[in-house]
């Protein structure tokens, strides 16, 4: 008989390698076929609700690592909530309207301007639906559990109808109006943009100082004096109608080179240096209020401008005097309106000057090309004091990446002025993670202007507005509901297939249309109004969902996006915020802090990672990330996640193998009968569960991951399971010490598997298949209960103290290894000269300390430590090579090898175990 045959070597079919790219897909197919999502919800019927509302990603292109971070985070939360006593449905959504779809069709050669609008929109719909299906497959492959058969999509007729009703309610309350004012205008998209659709990039721009001569100085300034302005947009000078000064500032009239100029006193030294004025003198100082309603002459055209007062003028840069073009700036517009100035915006949708511009040379010219022309004309007129160039951050269209301008156009707006305070009060009631999110959103709402909700595009939800014969806009509760019902049945394309009269309620009349003729609005709603209405189209409308949602979770850019638009529409209509909690996450960057881009070659595709490593590795990366700030990802970082995964998997495999002969119903040892170290591990396990569940409840997966991984690495692998081999392999199969340890290991397996299922559902489902538990799937089990024990504080204190003794012994062993006294720790004879405190502790523990320290021999001495002892906090320690021979069965070096004549090759312990449990060994003899 071989010595090996007398050992309890664990067996399991749970493989060392996960083969995740293959096995995950098989698990997902099985879950879908067995309707696990539906099963889980059925189990939870009647339990408290938890509604996480999915912010809809845009349906365009393959998913990226940012999508993975977002969707996996949501999946972890929903899985945890469902396993922890909540009814937690998850309806995934998609945002499908807007410019990106139109851009994709343009790339395919589809021209929206020459095509029937309804047919064009049908092509858009088909493309968007294809993208939804592609992304859905990708999200499923990440292991996300959701109601995939019933997603919400912003192009769905029912959703569009609810969005129309939200608009109608806001209109009825007086929050929607039509006006002409400067808005972000994308000449590349030929449409307005909301603030959330603008991003900033560095560009090189000209900056000029221009002199505007005084025309009527009201007896205070002479006509030989000029106002000096500074601007980075020379192309707006032809549209100048005013100059603004700050009424609280002082202004200096300076004489230089025989000419007089007005400059803000706080800016004088900086401007003089920039203009190279070495010899100038201040001839007069005026208050900003002195300038009010003076006039000046435009340096290029026969146009008289007015000087205005407003505190938006700062002394941070420029001259303290601001050139105003009311059609090309928000502040310009606001101050101009107070002074009764016209809104002058001589530019078309493509950024080209129209014939209204007072300069024939500029008509038809692109605004950016006009910079040089205008500067040259100013120089010829003697009005250009300086031209230079600088690089600065400038707004760009987030889709086309082209610069945008402010341009006054007639648009539909939503104003929050009437209910701003109500929104702010709702923000105060909500919980934000991180906490700074509350301040950020509060300040955005406090300071935000009106929301331009109209767009000059084709693919979107039409603005449900009719115009009478005298151009009066018609929006009534009856027209809104009639259009909503049509959209609900046929979709919003009905707006383009029916006449205005067919879309209006039967017999509809208006005093503004004596002939009964009406026309339809051609603009569509901003896509942020689409997604911002999802609380109505999904959470309020669908059975099984609740309003307000318990949680909105998106990237931190959504404070100005979805968090913002949803809040405005919801408070406008219901008086309540659509969410109780908001969780924001950072952006995914590479390991050097750069954005992912093809040009940098740092793009990591989730689909590529899944093919190479598996979705579990991405899920572990998500769980291990601190998402309160930007999250780094690279091949190296993913390899680290893969290493962590291997550690987890191999630890689970070891525990499965060593409980394969354990039946929890027959073999379990009760807690009071366990050894002290087994009790210690039970207590540590339950403390872990308590802390991890608390972290899950705070959506702090990073802490869950760290705590679980630390427990696996430090408490299990590096400690408990390390010395466990001497019991699991060597002791008799049915010995109480072995069964006690197996009881703990099995408990660890069951509870860790449940605890880690939200993060690693595929792997934990695989582990579950080897356990003897009643649920067919771990996803149908609940989070582990936390067990408490009467003696847990005492046991923890004692064994935590012992771990310090162990740490000192490990240091002494390491030193002895380096000195070549021993090879492996198991060859050592350790003599401890403990402190009184340590001696009392070791006596109290009454444990097999030698076995736990994994050494061959241990002596605890009351004598004084010799000079060569390693003096450490808990004991002085001497490490020597153990005397005797190595037992081939337990590998311990001991002097009692051969003490039992029946088994001369074994130590006394092993001989006794073999004799009792393998009687045939004595007859056959043992072979190594």
Swiss-Prot record:
Name of encoding gene: ileS
Cited function: Catalyzes the attachment of isoleucine to tRNA(Ile). As IleRS can inadvertently accommodate and process structurally similar amino acids such as valine, to avoid such errors it has two additional distinct tRNA(Ile)-dependent editing activities. One activity is designated as 'pretransfer' editing and involves the hydrolysis of activated Val-AMP. The other activity is designated 'posttransfer' editing and involves deacylation of mischarged Val-tRNA(Ile).
Motif, 'HIGH' region: chain positions: 57-67
GO cellular component: cytosol
Localization: Cytoplasm
Positions that bind ATP: 598
Enzyme Commission number(s): 6.1.1.5
Domain of life where this protein originates: Bacteria
Protein name: Isoleucine--tRNA ligase
Keywords: Aminoacyl-tRNA synthetase, ATP-binding, Cytoplasm, Ligase, Metal-binding, Nucleotide-binding, Protein biosynthesis, Zinc
Residues reported in the UniProt entry to bind Zn(2+): 887, 890, 907, 910
GO molecular function: aminoacyl-tRNA deacylase activity; ATP binding; isoleucine-tRNA ligase activity; tRNA binding; zinc ion binding
Binding note for cofactor: Binds 1 zinc ion per subunit.
Domain notes: IleRS has two distinct active sites: one for aminoacylation and one for editing. The misactivated valine is translocated from the active site to the editing site, which sterically excludes the correctly activated isoleucine. The single editing site contains two valyl binding pockets, one specific for each substrate (Val-AMP or Val-tRNA(Ile)).
CDD domains noted in UniProt: Anticodon_Ia_Ile_BEm (cd07960), IleRS_core (cd00818)
Pfam families: Anticodon_1, tRNA-synt_1, zf-FPG_IleRS
Chief localization: cytoplasm
Source organism of this protein record: Lactobacillus johnsonii (strain CNCM I-12250 / La1 / NCC 533)
Keyword Glycosyltransferase: no
Binding site for L-isoleucyl-5'-AMP: 554
Record-stated family: Belongs to the class-I aminoacyl-tRNA synthetase family. IleS type 1 subfamily.
């Amino acid at each position: 008989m071989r010595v090996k045959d007398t050992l309890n070597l664990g067996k399991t079919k749970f493989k060392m390698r996960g083969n995740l790219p293959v096995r995950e897909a098989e698990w997902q197919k099985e879950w879908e076929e067995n309707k696990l999502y539906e099963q889980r919800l059925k189990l939870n019927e009647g339990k408290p609700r938890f509604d996480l509302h999915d912010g809809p990603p845009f349906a365009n292109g393959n998913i990226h690592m940012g999508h993975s971070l977002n969707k996996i985070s949501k999946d972890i939360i929903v899985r945890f909530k469902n396993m922890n006593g909540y009814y937690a449905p998850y309806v995934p959504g998609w945002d499908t309207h807007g410019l990106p779809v139109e851009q994709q069709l343009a790339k395919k050669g589809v021209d929206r301007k020459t095509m029937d609008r309804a047919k064009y929109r049908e092509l858009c719909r088909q493309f968007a639906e294809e993208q939804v299906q592609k992304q859905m497959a990708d999200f499923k492959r990440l292991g996300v559990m959701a109601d995939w058969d019933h997603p919400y999509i912003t192009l769905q007729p029912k959703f569009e109808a609810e969005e129309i009703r939200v608009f109608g309610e806001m209109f009825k309350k007086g929050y929607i109006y039509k006006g002409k004012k400067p808005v972000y205008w994308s000449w590349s998209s030929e449409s307005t943009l909301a603030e959330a659709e603008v991003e900033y990039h560095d560009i090189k721009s000209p900056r000029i100082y221009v002199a505007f001569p005084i025309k009527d100085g009201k007896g205070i300034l002479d006509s030989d004096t000029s106002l000096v302005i500074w601007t980075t947009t020379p192309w707006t000078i032809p549209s100048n109608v005013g100059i603004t000064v700050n009424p609280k500032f002082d202004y200096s009239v300076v004489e230089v080179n025989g000419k007089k100029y007005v400059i803000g006193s706080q800016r004088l030294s900086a401007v003089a240096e920039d203009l190279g004025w070495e010899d100038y003198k201040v001839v007069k100082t005026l208050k900003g209020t002195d300038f009010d309603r003076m006039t000046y002459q435009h340096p290029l055209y026969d146009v008289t401008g007015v000087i205005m007062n407003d505190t938006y003028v700062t002394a941070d840069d420029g001259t303290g005097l601001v050139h105003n073009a009311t059609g090309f700036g928000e502040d310009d517009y606001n101050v101009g309106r107070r002074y009764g100035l016209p809104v002058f915006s001589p530019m078309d949708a493509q950024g080209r000057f129209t014939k209204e511009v007072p300069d024939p040379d500029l008509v038809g010219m692109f605004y950016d090309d006009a910079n040089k022309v205008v500067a040259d004309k100013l120089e010829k007129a003697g009005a250009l004091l300086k031209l230079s160039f600088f690089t600065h951050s400038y707004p760009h269209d987030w889709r086309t990446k082209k610069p945008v301008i402010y341009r006054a156009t007639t648009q539909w707006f939503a104003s929050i002025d009437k209910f701003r305070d109500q929104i702010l009060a709702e923000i105060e009631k909500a919980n934000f993670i991180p906490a700074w999110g509350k301040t950020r959103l509060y300040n955005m709402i406090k300071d935000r202007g009106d929301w331009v909700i109209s767009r000059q595009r084709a693919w979107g939800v039409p603005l449900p507005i009719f115009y009478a014969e005298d151009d009066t806009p018609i929006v009534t509760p009856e027209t809104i509901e009639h259009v909503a019902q049509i959209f609900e049945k046929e979709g919003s394309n009905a707006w383009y297939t029916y006449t205005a009269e067919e879309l209006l309620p039967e017999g509809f009349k208006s005093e503004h249309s004596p002939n009964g003729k009406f026309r339809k609005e051609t603009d569509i709603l901003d896509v942020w109004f689409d997604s911002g209405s999802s609380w109505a189209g999904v959470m309020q409308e669908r059975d099984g969902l609740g309003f307000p949602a318990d949680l909105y979770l998106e990237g931190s850019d959504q404070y100005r996006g979805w968090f913002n638009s949803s809040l405005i529409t919801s408070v406008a209509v219901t008086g309540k915020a659509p969410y109780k909690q908001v969780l924001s996450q950072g952006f995914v960057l590479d390991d050097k802090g750069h954005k992912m881009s093809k040009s940098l070659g740092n793009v990591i595709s989730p689909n590529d990672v899944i093919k190479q490593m598996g979705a579990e590795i991405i899920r572990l990366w998500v769980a291990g990330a601190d998402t309160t700030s930007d999250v780094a990802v690279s091949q190296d970082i993913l390899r680290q996640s893969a290493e962590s995964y291997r550690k987890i998997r191999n630890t689970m495999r070891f525990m499965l193998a060593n409980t394969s002969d354990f039946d929890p119903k027959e073999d379990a040892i009760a807690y009071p009968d366990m050894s002290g170290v087994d009790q210690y591990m039970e207590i540590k396990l339950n403390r872990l569960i308590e802390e991890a569940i608390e972290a899950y409840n705070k959506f702090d997966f990073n802490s869950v991951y760290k705590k679980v991984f630390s427990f696996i690495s430090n408490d299990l692998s590096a400690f408990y399971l390390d010395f466990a081999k001497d019991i699991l392999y060597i002791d008799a199969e049915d010995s109480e010490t072995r069964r006690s340890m197996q009881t703990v290991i099995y408990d660890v397996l069951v509870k860790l598997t449940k605890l880690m299922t939200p993060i690693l559902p595929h792997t934990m489902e695989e582990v579950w298949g080897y356990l003897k538990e009643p649920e067919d799937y771990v996803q149908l089990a609940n989070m582990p209960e936390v067990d408490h024990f009467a003696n847990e504080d005492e046991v923890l204190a004692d064994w935590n103290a012992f771990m310090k003794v162990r740490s000192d012994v490990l240091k002494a062993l390491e030193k002895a290894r380096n000195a070549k006294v021993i090879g492996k720790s198991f060859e050592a004879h350790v003599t401890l000269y403990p402190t009184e405190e340590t001696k009392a502790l070791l006596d109290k523990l009454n444990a097999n300390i030698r076995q736990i320290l994994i050494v061959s021999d241990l002596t605890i001495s009351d004598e004084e430590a010799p000079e060569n002892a390693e003096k450490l906090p808990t004991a002085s320690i001497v490490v020597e090579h153990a005397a005797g021979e190595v037992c081939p069965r337990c590998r311990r070096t001991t002097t009692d090898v051969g003490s039992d004549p029946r088994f001369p090759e074994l130590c006394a312990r092993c001989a006794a175990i073999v004799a009792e449990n393998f009687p045939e060994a004595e007859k056959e003899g043992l072979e190594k």
